[in-house]
């Protein structure tokens, strides 16, 4: 189906699927592919990528104008070209990862994206790189590997032990969330997003803590 079927090992995160979404994914991935060809990177180095994950995580505390150049540099030194693309209506797509030439491409949808979803999607895609999923020619959206990538993203953003201890406290107050986020060195909106996802607080709460990103594609 379209060009997407000629991108071996593509791994992607999306929240639904239909025939329209598959064609949208194909168009989106082709745009990411073409944009990545203008980006210079070092040779692929997975060990280096693993070593800079904490540096990437620390960027959650910065705004896009500040963190985007740093993120591009960190990933470029690991052989990864990151491209930011607008959301395509009907695609359900958050991000995708694949090999193009001599480097790895990570594409993320960014227009109007909440910070918590942006960083979750990024670390989800980085898991596909670190765990070698994209080097499997037959891999696309294997459910078990997608679930593993979700767990990786969740737990690197908010470590398991810290989170489990936090939710045993009065974790629903804004003050508690801000204090906890500062303690673990993460943006408070990411903590809010996690608590909302797990139905610990309503989705209507604390929108002032959730930053929306607009990043030029």
Language model features with spans:
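Active-site hotspot residues in diverse enzymes, especially metal/ion-binding acidic/histidine motifs
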Residues: 1-217
